[in-house]
Amino acid sequence: MIIRSPEPEVKILVDRDHIKTSFEEWARPGHFSRTIAKGPETTTWIWNLHADAHDFDSHTSDLEEISRKVFSAHFGQLSIIFLWLSGMYFHGARFSNYEAWLSDPTHIRPSAQVVWPIVGQEILNGDVGGGFRGIQITSGFFQIWRASGITSELQLYCTAIGGLVFAALMLFAGWFHYHKAAPKLAWFQDVESMLNHHLAGLLGLGSLSWAGHQVHVSLPINQFLNAGVDPKEIPLPHEFILNRDLLAQLYPSFAEGATPFFTLNWSKYADFLTFRGGLDPVTGGLWLTDTAHHHLAIAILFLIAGHMYRTNWGIGHGLKDILEAHKGPFTGQGHKGLYEILTTSWHAQLSLNLAMLGSLTIVVAHHMYAMPPYPYLATDYGTQLSLFTHHMWIGGFLIVGAAAHAAIFMVRDYDPTTRYNDLLDRVLRHRDAIISHLNWACIFLGFHSFGLYIHNDTMSALGRPQDMFSDTAIQLQPVFAQWIQNTHALAPGATAPGATASTSLTWGGGDLVAVGGKVALLPIPLGTADFLVHHIHAFTIHVTVLILLKGVLFARSSRLIPDKANLGFRFPCDGPGRGGTCQVSAWDHVFLGLFWMYNSISVVIFHFSWKMQSDVWGSISDQGVVTHITGGNFAQSSITINGWLRDFLWAQASQVIQSYGSSLSAYGLFFLGAHFVWAFSLMFLFSGRGYWQELIESIVWAHNKLKVAPATQPRALSIVQGRAVGVTHYLLGGIATTWAFFLARIIAVG
């Protein structure tokens, strides 16, 4: 730790009235670009307008101005998020059966959307129980509301109004911090202050206030709800907060106030800050006393972390010093220069953040089913499937975004003259070794993982089940995964004092939690079938990484095109007269990477959906016999490609295909429509620009004949625009098809 003399006291960190507010300016399309502001001559103008509106780098090269625009845009984004959240709460208040669900969450299904009868579509309002007709929702909002202690639709209504107030506040802040008091560049680059505020403020105080809410409001209300008390009889949140005796009746240690805290007798608080592990048998969710304890612990960690970095007091760590101290025996200058990169290139910063947030989102997807955090979430199979699928897709997109912005950084912000022998330079210098090895790994994984399936299909087709890779013939058990499962199942006795169960029931140990005759969670067995599909996961993920990493490492130059940096981030080919140079831009790698990301995530969500229906989800009889939705057919059926097609895709599509005439029919229409959107994408992906330009000119001729030709000259999409439209429809169509397939199936059988 370095002690320095204190900094000068007051720095002026904002510019006042930096840019005047002008509605005339905003009303002029393309006001941010000299070329676009001239107005449309050809139809390409509208595409350029969309491509460049938020590409602040193209408006100006002044880093301070770019930073201010990004900062202001973030407030706009937050305002939209608050507006959306407010809408969710408003639907809960105005169009939902929340209060009915709260009184009987095992038999009544959540609904917060009611279709108006205009052309007979009120058929979509299915009977969700409790005398309510509406569309069953699978977002998990009801479960979150119960966990936070919301007991009436009036409370939802008030929260919705609060959301609108915050949305307005954010819009104002976005305007204020760009037009009235715009921060200087030095403020954006003061990373130590930023870390302290984000760690201690957002994460530390955020977690602490949530822990406080859980202890003083959620826990007591949920305690009453679990005991079967009518929600209308439960005291209101402010009564618990203001009246300590109320809480002391439920949690005796409250009677002692803060004395145990200051006398370090913390174990007194163990009645509401627990460390049990496992699930609450009443609700099938994590113990809320465990989650309150968790948020308190997280808050302490982040409050400490938020006091580690050196600001005005000359004490603590400096980020630059930390980075420059990172030097290994084989890493040359190590992290020297990284500080400058991350404080002057927001693309580099964003790339790191997207990579971490994407990975974290995928971790969340897995925790939502393995450790279901909210009451009655685990037995709501539609919501479980939706939350997993949603977080997997989002994680995939964020990780591709990380590669996109890393490549933009390489093209626009990387300065090779100042970087020598630091880690990034060394990675770039042996990029051929990295990419060729990665390519070898992809080939190995592809042939071997696919080969195992092809072997099984062949043996199955020839009627030789004894020669197949399966749990009953030639076993390929995932021994490492099973070892990890067993270690965790045995851990509570050895690691966490007072923990009565392991972190997740999925690890093993024979415990099963069922709520209202439905399985919430049980140990998930892994076998040969999982071993096979896990290697498909490894294959698709490695190919995605290969494409994206090649795009980043060869963004500035390659043997084929040494001056690639001069061509920019996205370009169709290296100019006329140079054949075989198409699809080499960094943008094209992102484009191709998106398809493989789609492959990867599709296999993951198919695996999850079938595995859970086969081995986890189902009903339990009074005798304790579990009947799974698909009767445990995953282990024997998913070991052939034919099995995936026959017993998963085809067998489980019957609900969506036969949904016409029922309340699920919207999913049938979506299934059809999304297939069409997906097929429509192929038209953009398989045809070249010239084909369309010829067709357009013929159509323009006809318009001229009839004297109805437009003033703006029609143009075919550019090559890059065509690819962008193609991949968008491909992903949108594919994801919406999967969504309709999953939901119609799980709502019908779950």
UniProtKB/Swiss-Prot annotation:
InterPro entries: PSI_PsaA (IPR006243), PSI_PsaA/B (IPR001280), PSI_PsaA/B_CS (IPR020586), PSI_PsaA/B_sf (IPR036408). Its main location: plastid. It catalyses: reduced [plastocyanin] + hnu + oxidized [2Fe-2S]-[ferredoxin] = oxidized [plastocyanin] + reduced [2Fe-2S]-[ferredoxin]. It comes from the Eukaryota. Keywords: 4Fe-4S, Chlorophyll, Chloroplast, Chromophore, Electron transport, Iron, Iron-sulfur, Magnesium, Membrane, Metal-binding, Oxidoreductase, Photosynthesis, Photosystem I, Plastid, Thylakoid, Transmembrane, Transmembrane helix, Transport. Its EC number is 1.97.1.12. It is found in: Plastid, Chloroplast thylakoid membrane. It is a multi-pass membrane protein. Chlorophyll a binds at residues 683, 691. GO terms for molecular function: 4 iron, 4 sulfur cluster binding; chlorophyll binding; electron transfer activity; magnesium ion binding; oxidoreductase activity. Phylloquinone binds at residue 692. GO terms for cellular component: chloroplast thylakoid membrane; photosystem I. Disulfide bonds: none annotated. P700 is a chlorophyll a/chlorophyll a' dimer, A0 is one or more chlorophyll a, A1 is one or both phylloquinones and FX is a shared 4Fe-4S iron-sulfur center. The chain crosses the membrane at residues 70-93, 156-179, 195-219, 291-309, 346-369, 385-411, 433-455, 531-549, 589-610, 664-686, 724-744. GO terms for biological process: photosynthesis. [4Fe-4S] cluster binds at residues 573, 582. Chlorophyll a' binds at residue 675. The PsaA/B heterodimer binds the P700 chlorophyll special pair and subsequent electron acceptors. PSI consists of a core antenna complex that captures photons, and an electron transfer chain that converts photonic excitation into a charge separation. The eukaryotic PSI reaction center is composed of at least 11 subunits. PsaA and PsaB bind P700, the primary electron donor of photosystem I (PSI), as well as the electron acceptors A0, A1 and FX. PSI is a plastocyanin-ferredoxin oxidoreductase, converting photonic excitation into a charge separation, which transfers an electron from the donor P700 chlorophyll pair to the spectroscopically characterized acceptors A0, A1, FX, FA and FB in turn. Oxidized P700 is reduced on the lumenal side of the thylakoid membrane by plastocyanin. NCBIfam families: psaA. Belongs to the PsaA/PsaB family. This is Photosystem I P700 chlorophyll a apoprotein A1. It comes from Lactuca sativa. The gene is psaA.
